[in-house]
Swiss-Prot record:
It is an enzyme of class 2 (transferase). One of its GO terms (biological process) is thiamine biosynthetic process. Substrate binds at M52, G200. ATP binds at R127, T173. GO terms for molecular function: ATP binding; hydroxyethylthiazole kinase activity; magnesium ion binding. It catalyses: 5-(2-hydroxyethyl)-4-methylthiazole + ATP = 4-methyl-5-(2-phosphooxyethyl)-thiazole + ADP + H(+). The keyword Nucleotide-binding applies. CDD domains: THZ_kinase (cd01170). Catalyzes the phosphorylation of the hydroxyl group of 4-methyl-5-beta-hydroxyethylthiazole (THZ). Keywords: ATP-binding, Kinase, Magnesium, Metal-binding, Nucleotide-binding, Thiamine biosynthesis, Transferase. Gene3D superfamilies: 3.40.1190.20. NCBIfam families: PRK09355.1, thiM. This is Hydroxyethylthiazole kinase.
């Protein structure tokens, strides 16, 4: 295992983005109430198809036919947990890749226990901030809701261990994003602090990661490409935005117009 995270090339991101736009994956998002519309728009901008099917019986049916599933526990409650269990079980049986976004895990008991329960169904990837990843790995962390008081690099050892234990890819997002399968580590720079001042960029990234997990080929590379594309779009949107209000439309526009030749 590399002790120093490798960099990720624009050419690698370009290859994955081309594959993603061509595949146009159907992504089933069981996500939180605050970010549903924004998440759907981000997926649409990248030529994916979002769906939010929340009834437990229907969620199970839909996850079996979707290309990927996102589980985001931001606004978790008991009925939604039932739907998530059903969807994850169905996805697992169908071989559908699913991604866990463990929002505020470590700070609240029900969601922490629930997310640890879901790990038995082997997610294709886990995407969270440093505090969430450290808490999910069973380490002490400092977080407040969706905000993290821990540095993403400090959480990398926990991410590696979690990836090895579960057999998954773990993404720790922050000023620098780190992606690991427990053996290989990749660093993704870029993005902008503006992305932390609007609701939903991290949650939307998790949905994009789910879509990229459905692609054929090296999953670690595809997941890293998802982070690269979102960070680049955020950085470019910030450069032409006046503030958070104008950032969101510029961000969606950049995702919509971003092509492989812009990356390579």
């Amino acid at each position: 295992m590399n002790t120093q995270p490798a960099d990720f090339s624009a050419a690698q991101a370009a290859t994955s983005l081309t594959q993603f736009r061509s595949a146009a994956p159907l992504v089933h998002c069981l996500t939180n109430d605050v970010v549903q519309s924004f998440t759907a728009n981000v997926l649409l901008a990248l030529n994916a198809s979002p769906a939010m099917v929340v009834d437990p019986e229907e969620a199970a049916q839909f996850s079996a036919v979707a290309d990927a599933l996102l589980i985001n526990v931001g606004t978790l409650e008991r009925t939604r947990a039932e739907a998530m269990r059903a969807a994850v079980n169905s996805a697992h049986q169908a071989g559908t890749p699913w991604v866990l976004d463990p929002v505020a895990v470590g700070g609240l008991t029900f969601r922490t226990e629930f997310c640890r329960e879901l790990l038995t169904w082997k997610p294709a990837a886990i995407r969270g901030n440093a505090s969430e990843i450290m808490a999910l790995a069973g380490l002490a962390a400092q977080g407040r809701g969706v905000d993290s008081a821990d540095d993403s690099l400090a959480a990398l050892p926990a991410a590696r261990e979690l990836a090895r234990q579960v057999g998954t890819i773990v993404v720790v997002t922050g000023a620098v994003d780190y992606v690991t399968d427990g053996e290989r580590d990749i660093a993704v720079t870029g993005g902008d602090s503006m992305m932390t001042r609007v609701v939903g960029t991290g949650c939307a990234l998790s949905a994009v990661v789910a879509g990229f997990c459905s692609l054929e080929g090296d999953r670690l590379s595809h997941v890293t490409a998802a982070c690269y594309v979102m960070a680049l779009a955020g950085q470019q949107a910030t450069s032409v935005s006046q503030g958070t209000g104008s950032f969101i439309p510029h961000f969606l526009d950049r995702l919509y117009t971003l092509r492989a030749e812009d990356l390579a």
